[in-house]
Amino acid sequence: RLRRLIENNTLIRGIDVHNGLTGLIAEQISIDKEGFKKEFDFFWLSSLTDSTAKGKPDIELVDSTSRLNTIHDILEITTKPILFDADTGGIQEHFTYLVKTLERLGVSACVIEDKKGLKKNSLFGTEVKQKQEHIEVFSEKISSGKKALSGEDFMIIAKIESLILDQGMDDAIKR
């Protein structure tokens, strides 16, 4: 469903949800503007808010089982597309399993970033030196995820960290 929204609209609106309650609140938000109903088109489940809601730092500490349970809670109250923040995706074999599970649950897409090593959320600053995964390794991870899918609708979106890590636009385009 998210793919169709993107293809058919010039602008789509999403909001971060991190548990069933925030999903329920976001599901109910609707504004009537000049006779048109405005609401959120999709939900974003970020690792930052999911981790924070669990009292944990956003360093990929919250395991996939816990994050999948959060998705179950959100899916109980909505039929809106969900975009899942998969951080670095973990090791390739785990990422393949995660993608298959997300697709089976009905999640629309996941976003993986090209960082490697201990992940530190860049929203909290760049004082901790982060490194980018080698292009070939990152590309292979995405390819293995795509091969694991049973359909065409689920999307894997690459989040390239070149600009945040001061590597420049040329590096971002290359990646």
What would you call each of these model-derived segments?
Residues 1-175:
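Alpha/beta enzyme core
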